[in-house]
């Protein structure tokens, strides 16, 4: 089997490409980073290093790379031959990469699974929409499967530009009914993807966000520094207890299953061999205060059902206190708050009602 993976960054190489290669699939990376593309083409291999005491290392071999800046004959041929097309580029980039290969799908004769592996809900639907806007209706040999992916890959600098360190844990879940053909190892195929997407978003992403914003507020430089602070961990556990209420109420996970999942996630945050700067995890504040995102979505549910929400109120307030002037969204947030106030910002960007906004503002002013 052959795969084309768009996005030769750390997630692409250390997670998606690694899993595909482990299934004996020939992987061609497509990217616009000339340095990475040239290195992959020259070496045809790279190391994936686990963030554990042993630094367990796996050599990923038999890979190639193509510049995807424009539709070349080489990229066209790779798409025509591909059995799987995956992405890890950021959901906002999906419409851009769609332009680089969508027209070729009209010419494909073999079946292909297209899976967007992004940190966003139903990202493959976003990619599919962008593709169909270009191509119009496609044949029934083109299959779009949504997925949920989870693996922490921190910012890093390695001696070899291609080597990548990743946490030992990973989860890749794919819609079973939308997938065509043989199921792959290390991927969980499920009938309903939504519970897994929501559980990950409202446990991993919400927890990570709380650690970043609390860490920044209380003077901690890294997520690991934050998770060593007992007061911050108490806030973390309170927040994840509250998001667990939402998850258990809305999906088939039991309280015991969700509690075990929370402990596993906190254990990942505590990994001493894996840490991220709070400024990397915290960036993108306007997106992260959105009504369907990691803080406001569960908070709104708890508010509407008159359930405990003290932790999430503080998480929202800490986000509003975030002050990284190297992040465009945070600059926009700070400027809006300075001009119009916190409540107006929440009404504009979080789309919440006056009373819930007032609850957040009260906590914000007490910090």
From Swiss-Prot:
<dbReference type="GO" id="GO:0008926">
    <property type="term" value="F:mannitol-1-phosphate 5-dehydrogenase activity"/>
</dbReference>
<dbReference type="InterPro" id="IPR000669">
    <property type="entry name" value="Mannitol_DH"/>
</dbReference>
<dbReference type="InterPro" id="IPR013118">
    <property type="entry name" value="Mannitol_DH_C"/>
</dbReference>
<keyword id="KW-0560">Oxidoreductase</keyword>
<comment type="similarity">
    <text>Belongs to the mannitol dehydrogenase family.</text>
</comment>
<dbReference type="InterPro" id="IPR013328">
    <property type="entry name" value="6PGD_dom2"/>
</dbReference>
<dbReference type="Pfam" id="PF01232">
    <property type="entry name" value="Mannitol_dh"/>
</dbReference>
<dbReference type="GO" id="GO:0019592">
    <property type="term" value="P:mannitol catabolic process"/>
</dbReference>
<dbReference type="InterPro" id="IPR013131">
    <property type="entry name" value="Mannitol_DH_N"/>
</dbReference>
<protein>
    <recommendedName>
        <fullName>Mannitol-1-phosphate 5-dehydrogenase</fullName>
        <ecNumber>1.1.1.17</ecNumber>
    </recommendedName>
</protein>
<dbReference type="InterPro" id="IPR023027">
    <property type="entry name" value="Mannitol_DH_CS"/>
</dbReference>
<dbReference type="GO" id="GO:0005829">
    <property type="term" value="C:cytosol"/>
</dbReference>
<dbReference type="Pfam" id="PF08125">
    <property type="entry name" value="Mannitol_dh_C"/>
</dbReference>
<dbReference type="InterPro" id="IPR036291">
    <property type="entry name" value="NAD(P)-bd_dom_sf"/>
</dbReference>
<keyword id="KW-0520">NAD</keyword>
<dbReference type="InterPro" id="IPR023028">
    <property type="entry name" value="Mannitol_1_phos_5_DH"/>
</dbReference>
<feature type="binding site">
    <location>
        <begin position="3"/>
        <end position="14"/>
    </location>
    <ligand>
        <name>NAD(+)</name>
    </ligand>
</feature>
<dbReference type="InterPro" id="IPR008927">
    <property type="entry name" value="6-PGluconate_DH-like_C_sf"/>
</dbReference>
